[in-house]
C-alpha cells in the first residue's frame, strides 16, 4: 500500500523551505508545535499504559545497567550518540530539533496527571496502541513542517536517504535495533515496547501520507 511506502518527507505549501531557517513561515511553526504536542501526548499515553517503555528508554536502561551511570545520564549519552550519527548522514538540525526536546518533555509533564489509569490488561494494551498511533500522527505533522527533526527522526530520515527504503521499514529497523541492543545490555522489554517498535514506522508513514494529501500535495515520487 502506498500509504506505508513513503520514501521521503513531503514538502507542502506550508512547509519551511529549509530546515535551518531562522525566519520560518508562521504556519510552519504552528504545525511544528501541534505535531510535537501530539508526539508528547502519545509518549504520555505509552507511559500511562504501564506495560513497557519506548525502545530508546530500554536502550538507556541497558546502558545504565552496564555502565552503572544513572538513567538520566544514560539517556543523555544515547541521544549524543544518535546525534553524532547525523554527521556522516549529513542531517541538518533546525529549530525543530531543539523544540523536539523542550515541547515533548513539557507536554509529558503537563498531560501525565490527566491520563486515566487503564482498567485491566486490555485497557493497558489499547492505551499503548493509541499512544503509538498518536506519536506517529504527531511525527508526520511536525516533520512535514521541515524545521528540523528530533534525534531519532533525524536518524530515520538520514538512513532513508542513504538506503532508499520506505520510511516505515527504516523506522521499524531502528526501533527494533534499539530494543535488541537494550535488552542484551540488561534493559526491560514489555508488551508496550514491542507494540511501539513494530507500530511506529507504519504510523509515521501513514501520517506523512495523510498530512501531505490533506495539504493538497500530490504524492508521486515519494512512494512506489
Task: Please name every model-derived segment.
Residues 2-224:
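Core subunits and conserved enzymes of cellular information-processing
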Amino acid at each position: 500500500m502506498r500509504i506505508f511506502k513513503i520514501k521521503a518527507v513531503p514538502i507542502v505549501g506550508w512547509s519551511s523551505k529549509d530546515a535551518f531557517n531562522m525566519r520560518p513561515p508562521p504556519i510552519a511553526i504552528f504545525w511544528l508545535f501541534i505535531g510535537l504536542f501530539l508526539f508528547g501526548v502519545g509518549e504520555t499515553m505509552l507511559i500511562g499504559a504501564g506495560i513497557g517503555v519506548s525502545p530508546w528508554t530500554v536502550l538507556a536502561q541497558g546502558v545504565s545497567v552496564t555502565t552503572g551511570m544513572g538513567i538520566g545520564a544514560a539517556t543523555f549519552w544515547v541521544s549524543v550518540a544518535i546525534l553524532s550519527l547525523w554527521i556522516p548522514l549529513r542531517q541538518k538540525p533546525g529549530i525543530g530539533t531543539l523544540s523536539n526536546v523542550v515541547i515533548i518533555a513539557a507536554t509529558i509533564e503537563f498531560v501525565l496527571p490527566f491520563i486515566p489509569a487503564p482498567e485491566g490488561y486490555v485497557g493497558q494494551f489499547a492505551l499503548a496502541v493509541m499512544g503509538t498511533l498518536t506519536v506517529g500522527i504527531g511525527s508526520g505533522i511536525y516533520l512535514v513542517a521541515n524545521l528540523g527533526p528530533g534525534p531519532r527522526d533525524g536518524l530515520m530520515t538520514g538512513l532513508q536517504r542513504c538506503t532508499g527504503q520506505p520510511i516505515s521499514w527504516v523506522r521499524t529497523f531502528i526501533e527494533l535495533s534499539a530494543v535488541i541492543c537494550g535488552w542484551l545490555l540488561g534493559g526491560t522489554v514489555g508488551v508496550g515496547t514491542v507494540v511501539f517498535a513494530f507500530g511506529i514506522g507504519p504510523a509515521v508513514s501513514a501520517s506523512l501520507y495523510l498530512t501531505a494529501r490533506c495539504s493538497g500535495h500530490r504524492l508521486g515520487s515519494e512512494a512506489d
